[in-house]
């Protein structure tokens, strides 16, 4: 039984990490095929609000990792005449682990990340825009609800690589990995709604 639980947990982690790797490969291929290094004029400021699901990364007292929730908001400034943006973020994700597989003996490790971000948009302004992003900032780690292992509240560095694609300038699908403190790392997928930052109409267009 323990062997089955461990394999299930490892399989879930491999699925998430494989998805991230495949997304990075797809972005690289699409960027190579784009063949256009020029940037497209878009709105200077944009924001996206996102929700999603995540799983714990790494071992923490041999707990069985379970699916949990995440949410966040990004505000970005699109740097003129480039494909880069820079901004700020608030990201909240949980690393949920079950310790008896009965739902009554668990711990939910929460991370709140606040900081700065930068991203490269491979096809900025197009209907399909792959991107790669780095988030770096301040992490607040605590435990939500029941405490199997007393932890308290601690702070540290928050780091998160993100890859994804923006569709039709208003939907944003992302895969990420959050790194902060042992027992609190997580990886997952999110879906966001983008406000602003749309492609500007060419002055020559009627």
What name fits each language-model region?
Residues 1-44, 199-206:
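Cleavable N-terminal export/targeting peptides
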Residues 40, 89-99, 152-155, 159-206:
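Predominantly the C-terminal beta-signal and adjacent terminal strand-loop region
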Residues 41-47, 65-71, 108-114, 128, ...:
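Residues that define the transmembrane beta-barrel architecture of outer-membrane proteins
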Residues 69-146, 167, 171, 192-199:
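Gram-negative (and chloroplast) outer-membrane scaffold detector with strong preference
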Residues 58-61, 100-106, 145-151, 176-178:
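Extracellular loop and loop/strand-boundary signature of outer-membrane beta-barrel proteins
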Residues 31-86, 187-200, 206:
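Short glycine/proline- and aromatic-enriched beta-strand/turn motifs that initiate or cap beta-hairpins
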């Amino acid at each position: 039984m323990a062997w089955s639980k461990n394999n299930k947990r490892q399989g879930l982690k491999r699925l998430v990490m494989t998805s991230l790797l495949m997304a990075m490969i797809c972005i690289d291929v699409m960027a190579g095929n784009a063949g256009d290094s020029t940037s497209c004029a878009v709105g200077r400021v944009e924001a996206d609000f996102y929700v999603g699901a995540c799983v714990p990364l790494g071992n923490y007292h041999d707990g069985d990792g379970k699916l949990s929730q995440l949410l966040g908001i990004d505000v970005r400034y699109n740097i003129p005449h480039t494909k880069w943006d820079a901004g700020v973020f608030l990201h909240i994700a949980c690393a949920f682990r079950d310790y008896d597989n009965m739902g009554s003996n668990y711990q939910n490790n929460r991370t709140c990340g606040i900081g700065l971000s930068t991203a490269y948009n491979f096809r900025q302004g197009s209907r399909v825009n792959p991107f790669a992003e780095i988030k770096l900032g301040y992490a607040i780690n605590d435990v939500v609800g029941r405490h199997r292992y007393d932890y308290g509240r601690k702070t540290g560095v928050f780091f998160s690589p993100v890859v994804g694609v923006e569709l039709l300038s208003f939907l944003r699908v992302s895969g990420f990995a959050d790194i902060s403190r042992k027992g609190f790392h997580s990886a997952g997928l999110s879906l966001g709604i983008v406000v602003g930052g749309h492609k500007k109409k060419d002055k020559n267009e009627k």
